[in-house]
Design a protein with these regions (language model features):
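Outer membrane beta-barrel
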Residues: 1-136, 143-148, 152-161
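Surface-exposed beta-loop-beta
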Residues: 137-198
Length: 198
């Protein structure tokens, strides 16, 4: 029995509550979303705890905090904390097709911190490039940055193909005998069919 984020049983609790503000201007955009709940405590438990100004306690209530500037007619550059680009379902259950999520969602990053360059090549084709602190972390856990990419192709009004990837070194503290570290690669292809079952 796998439900949304059931980290507690037989108790009343708030899974996720958030409030957000958004700015959409012609050349600038921004979003700030604050959050709390049991899923927040669980999902931010791997954030770095030893940094003075950015640590697990100071960042876990930030769902998104980014600003963007329009570089061209169909090109945006965003910087800050934003929802992860990989995966078919969202962390906020209300945004999903069904309330009970797939277990695969727990193997993709809910959020990313970094810089995102997005460009709409045509009405059908768009691309994104990401430079991030790493796999689902706000405070960088090492000196290396991660890279990500997305290519989305709208086949029709009811169907879209999306390809995402991620590559990055996610080793937190390599020892003298482990200097190579761990490189984490993720590739995700998804086809969305927008036909309603109802």
């Amino acid at each position: 029995n796998y439900t949304t984020q059931a980290i507690q049983n037989d108790t009343f609790a708030i899974n996720l509550a958030h409030i957000e503000g958004k700015l959409d201007a012609e050349r600038f955009r921004a979003r700030l979303a604050l959050q709390t709940g049991t899923s927040v405590n669980a999902n931010y438990s791997n954030e770095t705890t030893n940094q003075k100004y950015s640590n697990q306690n100071s960042v876990r209530n930030i769902q998104e905090a980014y600003v963007g500037i329009k570089l061209g007619k169909k090109t945006w550059l965003d910087a800050g904390i934003y929802m992860g680009n990989i995966g078919f379902e969202a962390w906020v259950s209300a945004y999903n097709w069904v309330y009970t999520r797939a277990i695969v969602l727990d193997n993709v990053p809910y959020y990313s911190t970094g810089v995102r360059l997005s460009h709409e090549i045509s009405d059908q084709l768009s691309v994104q490039l990401h430079i991030m602190n790493g796999w689902q972390n706000i405070t960088d856990n090492n000196k290396d940055k991660a890279l990500g990419m997305q290519v989305a192709y709208k086949i029709s009004d009811k169907m879209k193909f999306t390809y995402n990837n991620f590559i990055g070194n996610e080793t937190t503290a390599p020892t003298k005998t482990d200097t190579i570290g761990t490189v984490y690669m993720y590739s995700n292809e998804q086809i969305k069919n927008y036909t309603s079952p109802y």
